[in-house]
Amino acid sequence: MPRVWKFGDQINTDDILPGKYAPFMVGEDRFHLYAFAHLRPEFAKEVRPGDILVFGRNAGLGSSREYAPEALKRLGVRAIIAKSYARIFFRNLVNLGIVPFESEEVVDALEDGDEVELDLESGVLTRGEERFALRPPPPFLLEALKEGSLLDYYKKHGRFPGE
């Protein structure tokens, strides 16, 4: 069952993937192994496909390092729940096919290590007997996810979903 990895407010792209581990520094095939190297050194070894990241306010602020969310995607992260997002980080998540949900209530309710199920289409998150309703992703994003990401969709169809 997917687990929650909970972080605090103001987690920036350098926290997610420190610059010294950028693809051009350590190699395109290894950079994701350093996700959260300074905050949670065990993260890259222990995260499993489908696990969910939970952030507080202003998730992903800082420089526009697309390789930070790319590292998360390579590790199997499919969704993030935050109180709020930095705009560029939010857009990079959408482009890469990681679903960004936003909910103060759910962030406050979840704890690090919780086991949860998340239906990406409906936005329903289940923890034991509890159910939380997140705003479901827009139809264009769900369509893009069928191909892997918004970028993958564009490469295959030569247009964006809904055009």
Curated annotation (Swiss-Prot):
Belongs to the LeuD family. Heterodimer of HacA and HacB. It catalyses: (2R,3S)-homoisocitrate = cis-homoaconitate + H2O. This is Homoaconitase small subunit. The lineage of its organism: Bacteria, Thermotogati, Deinococcota, Deinococci, Thermales. Its EC number is 4.2.1.36. Catalyzes the reversible hydration of cis-homoaconitate ((Z)-but-1-ene-1,2,4-tricarboxylate) to homoisocitrate ((1R,2S)-1-hydroxybutane-1,2,4-tricarboxylate). Can catalyze neither the dehydration of (R)-homocitrate ((2R)-2-hydroxybutane-1,2,4-tricarboxylate) into cis-homoaconitate in vitro, nor the reverse reaction. Is not active toward (S)-homocitrate, cis-aconitate or citrate as substrate. CDD domains: IPMI_Swivel (cd01577). It comes from Thermus thermophilus (strain ATCC BAA-163 / DSM 7039 / HB27). One of its GO terms (biological process) is lysine biosynthetic process via aminoadipic acid. Keywords: Amino-acid biosynthesis, Lyase, Lysine biosynthesis. Optimum pH is 8.0. One of its GO terms (molecular function) is homoaconitate hydratase activity. InterPro entries: Aconitase/3IPM_dehydase_swvl, AconitaseA/IPMdHydase_ssu_swvl, IPMI_Swivel, LeuD, LeuD_type2/HacB/DmdB. The keyword Amino-acid biosynthesis applies. Pathway: Amino-acid biosynthesis; L-lysine biosynthesis via AAA pathway; L-alpha-aminoadipate from 2-oxoglutarate: step 3/5. Pfam families: Aconitase_C. It comes from the Bacteria. Is not inhibited by lysine. Gene3D superfamilies: Aconitase, domain 4. The gene is hacB.
